[in-house]
Regions:
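Conserved beta-hairpin
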Residues: 12-23
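A conserved beta-strand-loop-helix scaffold within acyl/acetyltransferase catalytic domains
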Residues: 19, 26-34
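Conserved acetyl-CoA pyrophosphate-binding loop and the N-cap/start of the following alpha-helix
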Residues: 47, 51-56
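Active-site rim helix/loop that mediates acceptor-substrate recognition in acyltransferases
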Residues: 1-13
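Short, surface-exposed charged micro-motifs
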Residues: 2-4, 25-28
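C-terminal structural segments of small proteins and small subunits
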Residues: 59-92
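Conserved acetyl-CoA binding element of GNAT-fold acetyltransferases
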Residues: 35-44
């Protein structure tokens, strides 16, 4: 599963496309220059249960580590993933 990323420095998204259509998306907004707030995660029914949501959260963690920023997971799904993976605490 290839997770793509768009970022315009005020908001952004990690997403998955299939046949040229966005089938999953996790959106965020920037809070200053050193923090993003994950506010929503959505996965089309046809991709549910395949770990796509997890892959988008994992991509956000990699991005945060590379950029040396922190994440505030307001989205209930993202928050649940962060709770399951204590090794992600470094970006919270």
């Amino acid at each position: 599963m290839n997770v793509l990323h768009e970022n315009d420095h005020s908001k952004g998204a990690f997403y998955v496309e299939q046949d040229g259509q966005r089938k999953a998306e996790m959106t965020y907004t920037w809070a200053g220059t050193d923090r993003i707030i994950i506010d929503h995660t959505e996965v089309d029914d046809e991709l549910r249960g395949q770990g796509v949501g997890y892959e988008m959260v994992f991509a956000s963690v990699q991005f945060a580590r590379e950029q040396q920023i922190s994440i505030v997971p307001l989205c209930p799904f993202a928050k649940s993933v962060f709770n399951k993976y204590p090794e992600f605490k470094d970006v919270l």
